[in-house]
Amino acid sequence: MASLEAHYSARDIDARILAALRAVGLNPDKRLSPEELGALDHFHTGGLRASLELLELAQIRAEHRVLDIGAGLAGPARMLASKLGCRVDCIELSPDYCAGAALLNRLTGLEDRIAVHRGSALEMPFADDSFDAAGMQNVGMNIADKRQLYAEIRRVLKPGGRFAFQEMAAGKTPTTHFPLPWATDPSDSHLVSADEMRSVLGECGFTTECLEDTSEEHLNRTGANATPSAPGQLGLAVFVDNLGQKAGNARRSLEDGQVRLVRGVFLKN
């Protein structure tokens, strides 16, 4: 756990974010739109595009109460609150990311629709049957106990609630290219195959609506020469150290078949 907390540490994140906003000509003293922050606050494979595609699959409506699991800087939560007007609760383990999320919620004027909670996805501070939908992007790779994770998500969903996710799944061979965006070394990378995800979710009381492998689609879209933003620009490098190396290793892992990118929607029985 200590190594995982260090991996997701982003000291002085508020100052970093404010400096990056000003560097690209955005005024943090005026209300910003979630769209202006899209390159910064979607810390998962595919970024904002992946969030929009998952939103379409999830079929979330304005009246829904939504849970964002492992929310990071809460970019998807702001997207939901802004586009649909729904209420979103975020659960995030990193105190630095919680601070950054709260700052960006204030800067976009969405703090009344989004609540940020620091805590673990394995023991969430919510009552049973609280949410109409839950979303999770590139989070389960850090959690070894998938059964407890899925059981806890099911607990907080209402009957018939929808769980939409994007994750890296295990490929045909072990992962060898480190550091990765989700783990500095193998001790914090807990990948399982897409088939095992489906099986454990079923055992935990979920029904499959869809589960698809989007690895090749992602590789074709991004291109081998795609480069992350540099420090001082508005992008993930504002708060993710060694982003170029981590992103490059993630691409190599996909190309080598060591990991697969999957997304799915499951319904609570």
What does each model-found stretch correspond to?
Residues 147-162:
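A short glycine-rich, Lys/Arg-flanked "PGG" loop and its adjoining helix->strand segment in the class I
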Residues 1-24:
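N-terminal auxiliary segments of SAM/dcSAM-dependent transferases
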Residues 27, 44-62:
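Conserved alpha-helix/loop element of class I SAM-dependent methyltransferases that forms part
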Residues 168-188:
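Short, glycine-/aromatic-enriched active-site segment of Class I SAM-dependent methyltransferases
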Residues 65-69, 73-123:
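Class I SAM-dependent methyltransferase SAM/SAH-binding core
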Residues 212-269:
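Conserved Class I S-adenosyl-L-methionine
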Residues 122-133:
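A short acidic, Gly/Pro-enriched loop at the edge of an enzyme's catalytic core
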Residues 133-145:
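A short SAM/SAH-binding and catalytic strip from SAM-dependent methyltransferases
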